């Protein structure tokens, strides 16, 4: 018999405490909660966008991991001194960039419960509560959105639909595209995969293109159909129909359409009903991506934006964007779960069990790409229970109200203009050419380019101040500044203050331009 090397005994003596000692977990856990509570109490004081340079952290941290244990107190000191300065503070009330990643006490504590239990719910048997809670909360949220019953689980099995929690929209789109692909190839033969065509607008999330690549779609057959200001950058059903007919004439096979409710660039809304009508003429799978704006559709006044969803095949929204649930939590509903399962299921011997064989349970591993899966439903359950439908609607409406307030402030300053209509809680605006060029005579083809350049300088100046953070988009060749309200801590005073910051930096930039603009 051999013996353990001496250094093994040395390592054991250095850390004799069990890594899951309940008393130590309680002590350190309280410290972390206090630390985060203090962070949120003071988050408004930090520069919203990080001020560090690339590679800053490598200069601060050791080149190798510690040999001996370090205390949680020391680690938290390093978090304060080294990590927080390198964070962009998405939960700051002065964060108006990208789309929100709205947090909440219920979301954080639900995440804590999920992580604390640390179960791996790939099938029903591996943790029945994780599977069953997920199917329940997906039905709850589907009912809040008044989704058709065909998208929900039914107790009598009359519906073939249901919901699943994915990590992100990227995963949801890839899963549905894979299901659509296999369903079509079973009809026309797998040798015809290069004929399959995927459709979207030029405003659709870039994740669709990545999903198409992964799913083996010929890159030439990924078609981003042009939109215009005439339709507020929504996809035209006529443009879709003419594109499809041209493809059929060329011997291609229309497969998949991704329509969007609330595009990333401008929150444009594709006309769901008319697009579905066109798609169904050609047997196309329709996925509705409502990653951002879907949450608002629990409010009756916004529900009409998803009218026509009954004719779609799948629908998704990100609860981690504007529904007070921590990343990651993408809600996906499908009408035909069998197609999803057929495309994604595996059945290795070591996962076989009586519950699965009975066909009376859901094995969510067959509804997603990965095998392992997190207990995401716990945090969504806590959010739904802790706030209730009434309060969730109130929170969402307050963000829309603040966006309207910001829009009103823009309207009172004739140097600015709204570029696209505000639909939800994001305002897209820019400095007008007239404010930049004043009475200078400028070549028409230079006006937009120089206007875009000045607006880009304005945005960078504002963001560099650290007082607020916004991002930009370009639609129809126009550079615009996006002001997205949605951080949980944001109040009207923050919106008013943000506008004052924009005006101050505008004054400085226009003053510097002086009479030199040409």
Swiss-Prot record:
Q: In which tissues is it expressed?
A: Predominantly expressed in the roots.
Give a Pfam family name. Pyridoxal_deC
Q: Signal peptide location in the record?
A: none
Query: EC top class, in one word?
Result: lyase
User: Residues bearing N6-(pyridoxal phosphate)lysine?
Assistant: 321
* Gene Ontology terms: cellular component: cytoplasm
Q: Which UniProt keywords apply?
A: Decarboxylase, Lyase, Pyridoxal phosphate
Question: Could you tell me which InterPro entries the record lists for this protein?
Answer: Aromatic_deC (IPR010977), PyrdxlP-dep_de-COase (IPR002129), PyrdxlP-dep_Trfase (IPR015424), PyrdxlP-dep_Trfase_major (IPR015421), PyrdxlP-dep_Trfase_small (IPR015422), Pyridoxal-P_BS (IPR021115)
The EC number(s) attached to this protein equal 4.1.1.28, 4.1.1.25
At the top level, the lineage of the source is Eukaryota
**What cofactors are annotated for this protein?**
pyridoxal 5'-phosphate
Q: Which reaction does it catalyse?
A: L-tyrosine + H(+) = tyramine + CO2; L-dopa + H(+) = dopamine + CO2; 5-hydroxy-L-tryptophan + H(+) = serotonin + CO2
GO annotation, biological process: amino acid metabolic process; carboxylic acid metabolic process
**Hydrolase is among the record's keywords:** no
Q: Which GO terms describe its molecular function?
A: 5-hydroxy-L-tryptophan decarboxylase activity; L-dopa decarboxylase activity; pyridoxal phosphate binding; tyrosine decarboxylase activity
What is the annotated quaternary arrangement, including any partners?
Answer: Homodimer.
Q: What family name appears in the similarity comment?
A: Belongs to the group II decarboxylase family.
Q: Which PANTHER family match?
A: GROUP II PYRIDOXAL-5-PHOSPHATE DECARBOXYLASE, TYROSINE DECARBOXYLASE
Q: What's this chain's function?
A: Marginally higher substrate specificity for L-DOPA over L-tyrosine.
- UniProt name for this protein: Tyrosine/DOPA decarboxylase 1
Q: Which organism is it from?
A: Papaver somniferum
